[in-house]
């Protein structure tokens, strides 16, 4: 079940029959304080999604030209488009996780069973993982640009964003 950070904390406390701890409350208060930065990051990535995906795919195919060569897994424009579509879907679900402050939407809706699907299709998961890392590099560069974004330290949010991409890459590798 997909949960945001608030629902997850409440569900965990309820399952244990406990009140929310000071640490849990502090973490949720911090999440609220950081909300504008989170929205800014999601907006930046979403607004640049097509170029992020396009550049990640170009870079992946430049580094691994065997993928688009005859006999390669992304050979033919239809197969290459499917690869780009998959990168786009993963990026979209990463933005949902960033907004929610929780990876469950990414896990449940995008990553659960993806490795097995790629294995069944003969898709090289390691190549998909490289593509995801390229999405990460571009997304973080855009998110880290200090111009026109809520002021303040974004290092923990950027680390969180990085973690969602790493989680996605590990799920397919």
From Swiss-Prot:
Keyword Ribonucleoprotein appears in the UniProt entry: no
Induction profile: Phycocyanin-3 is expressed in red light under conditions of sulfur deprivation.
Residues at which (2R,3E)-phycocyanobilin 2 binds: 154
InterPro entries, per database record: Globin-like_sf (IPR009050), Phycobilisome_asu/bsu (IPR012128), Phycobilisome_asu/bsu_sf (IPR038719), Phycocyanin_b (IPR006247)
Residues with N4-methylasparagine modification: 73
UniProt keyword Electron transport present: yes
Highest taxon, organism lineage: Bacteria
Record: residues binding (2R,3E)-phycocyanobilin 1: 83
A biological process term (GO) from this entry: photosynthesis
Changes after translation: Contains two covalently linked bilin chromophores.
GO CC annotation, single: phycobilisome
Main location: membrane
Membrane-topology annotation of the record: Peripheral membrane protein
Location relative to the cell: Cellular thylakoid membrane
Keyword terms, alphabetized: Antenna complex, Bile pigment, Chromophore, Electron transport, Membrane, Methylation, Photosynthesis, Phycobilisome, Thylakoid, Transport
Subunit record text: Heterodimer of an alpha and a beta subunit, which further assembles into trimers and the trimers into hexamers.
Functional note: Light-harvesting photosynthetic bile pigment-protein from the phycobiliprotein complex (phycobilisome, PBS). Phycocyanin is the major phycobiliprotein in the PBS rod.
Protein name from the UniProt record: C-phycocyanin-3 beta subunit
Organism: Microchaete diplosiphon
Lineage: Bacteria, Bacillati, Cyanobacteriota, Cyanophyceae, Nostocales
């Amino acid at each position: 079940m997909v949960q945001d950070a608030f629902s997850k904390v409440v569900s965990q406390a309820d399952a244990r029959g406990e009140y929310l701890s000071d640490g849990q409350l502090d973490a949720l208060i911090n999440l609220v304080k950081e909300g504008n930065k989170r929205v800014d990051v999601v907006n930046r990535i979403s607004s640049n999604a097509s170029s992020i995906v396009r550049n990640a795919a170009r870079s992946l195919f430049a580094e691994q030209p065997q993928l688009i060569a005859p006999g390669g897994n992304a050979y033919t424009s239809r197969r290459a488009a499917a690869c780009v579509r998959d990168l786009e879907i993963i990026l979209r679900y990463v933005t949902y996780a960033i907004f929610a402050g929780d990876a469950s939407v990414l896990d449940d809706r995008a990553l659960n069973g993806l490795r097995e699907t790629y294995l069944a299709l003969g898709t090289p998961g390691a190549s998909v993982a490289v593509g995801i890392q390229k999405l990460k590099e571009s997304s973080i560069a855009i998110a880290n640009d200090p111009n026109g974004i809520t002021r303040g330290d974004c290092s923990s949010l950027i680390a969180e964003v990085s973690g969602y991409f790493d989680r996605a890459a590990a799920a397919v590798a």
